[in-house]
Amino acid sequence: MSKIYNFNPGPAMLPKEVLLEIKKNFLNWNNSGFSITEISHRSSSFIEFTIQVEKDLRNLLHIPENYNILFSHGGARGQFSAIPMNLIKKFKKPDYINSGYWSKCAAKEAKKYCEPNIINVKRYTKNKQKYIESPINWKITSKHTYLHYCPNETIEGIEIFEEPILLNKIIIGDFSSTILSRKINIKKYGMIYACAQKNIGPAGITIIIIRNDLLISCKKKIPSILDYQLLFKSKSMLNTPSIFSWYVSGLVFKWIKNLGGLNVIEKKNIKKAKILYKYLNSTNFYYNCILPSNQSRMNVTFNLYKNELTNFFIQESEKSGLYGLKGHSIIGGLRASIYNAMPIEGVKKLIQFMKNFEKKFG
């Protein structure tokens, strides 16, 4: 059977080394006689494992000691509610940057609990390619202390590489699709969060990295499962967590550490994205609509000039072992999600398929 490559935006591809480790331990984890799916979250062996998981993540992202790491349920959408519910007592009218679909979803959910000031980021076109204004030009209100934004919009393939520098501003970032793909200066943020199913592991666990002073100031009367203080006090085990997702996440952190950390991962991701965008720029059969300054390293969106061939392209790509290339239903087209676990061989195979398809139908 030929090698299969998963270009889905999530659940995404997992590293082969991690899959082999899962296979080895699935029926008998840590020589316990139990499957990892059966192990008690209260067992000393699993608690010891979670301590190492947190330590590895803290080292990978250089998380300062005055930040806490929480493991939660509900994905990023759960955090769209949890953030205003926990923090709005202190920050009554937050700012929400609208740079695309997911940041817009976060703002829409926040409206249920507060009156967010929505800042629509300006969009421009240059040589038929779109880009958005730099964070330094965002019209931020000085009186609103907490600012929420999403640095990578997966649907359109737009990434914001500049980190906002805002004095006296609590910055909260939805890093669901870009966490662990590049270096982040955690000190610039009051809180960041990410669902697992893109660069971390299987869906089922959500990572929250929150500064101590924000954790202390959280509201009290909110649903327990979304309460940051309760999550912290219970060591992220207020109820039975997603053991398997937590376990695989730990294996992924170890895999990144063994590769050499985020410096190595970021270089690999830059290289993968560079060769794919370079090919797209060299052809008159496909095109990408995003200016290089905002081209996502994780989600490469593109179209065929002969749009009527799009569905056939998807069918033929699957026959070649290339899955998940259909664009989001909102904008259509095509999308290759090339998260951390996607090897450069997968990107090269995609490019070769695209060249062959162009020869046949161009």
Curated annotation (Swiss-Prot):
The scientific name of the source species is Buchnera aphidicola subsp. Cinara cedri (strain Cc)
Residue(s) carrying N6-(pyridoxal phosphate)lysine: 198
Quote the pathway field: Amino-acid biosynthesis; L-serine biosynthesis; L-serine from 3-phospho-D-glycerate: step 2/3; Cofactor biosynthesis; pyridoxine 5'-phosphate biosynthesis; pyridoxine 5'-phosphate from D-erythrose 4-phosphate: step 3/5
The name under which this protein is listed is Phosphoserine aminotransferase
Question: Which cofactors does it use?
Answer: pyridoxal 5'-phosphate
Which residues are involved in binding L-glutamate? Answer: 42
Q: Does the keyword Nucleotide-binding apply?
A: no
What family is reported?
A: Belongs to the class-V pyridoxal-phosphate-dependent aminotransferase family. SerC subfamily.
Assigned EC number: 2.6.1.52
